[in-house]
């Protein structure tokens, strides 16, 4: 299975003080142990991680440091990590995408689908996405 990690999964994984850090770490470890599992990244979730990391109230971090943290997370996945260039146009949204807040989710879901992957998220409101179990 291939999983495109969205920004909220990356933030939970990257910061120990995040309420979903432990279950996301367990899920990644469990999936890493399964043959054929890979974790995908793309520019939008990566930028989301950097933006949220810099804005966190739990600690100040620079843009460069946040990018380094993210690079370290992907390096920890070794050959289980693959970067997906994002060549999807900003059009052709699915019928469930009706609000501005849904456009990025819809785009990432389509990007994952186009690469035979599942969008891995903590958001229960994205049709067809894989919701990482946290509870």
Predicted regions and their residues:
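Residues that scaffold the ATP/ADP-binding catalytic core of kinase and kinase-like folds
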Residues: 12-14, 52, 129
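Catalytic metal-binding/acid-base residues of hydrolase active sites
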Residues: 10, 125-126
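Short, mixed-charge aromatic SLiMs
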Residues: 36-37, 68-79, 135
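Active-site neighborhoods of divalent-metal-dependent phosphate/nucleic-acid chemistry enzymes
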Residues: 76-124
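Short, well-structured N-terminal submotif of metal-dependent ribonuclease cores
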Residues: 1-41, 56-68
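Active-site regions of enzymes building and remodeling cell-envelope glycoconjugates
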Residues: 128-135
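Short, conserved alpha-helical segments within structured domains
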Residues: 41-46, 104
